[in-house]
């Protein structure tokens, strides 16, 4: 994708030109230009849909992201090229799981981001990028938000 400066590769993929979509499995990795740097997205499955200027990239299961000053994990990811919204999501917990898991166990499934000495977590994390510069403008954490940072004396939570 030369318009959005995105690349997706993996060991197996299928392209559906009529539907403007592609699916990549078996070690898929997507590379997206963000902040004049590369954001690497790895997942069990990557799905790209829509024309280049409106492309949506969705990653399922075991998502890992990495950029020079930011890294993270989540169950799934949704990247909207047009709006610049990157969502790190937790797979919804079913009724049976909610009965078996403690609140602490459910929180451990939340997406997590690390930047420098800061760890951020919550049920849903939004990274908003400027659609013209691809710079990360803001970060929002929804529900059960935790931001922890370790200083030189002792750890503290914000």
Can you name each region flagged by the protein language model?
Residues 1-158:
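Structural signature for solvent-exposed beta-strand/loop edge elements and short helix-capping sites
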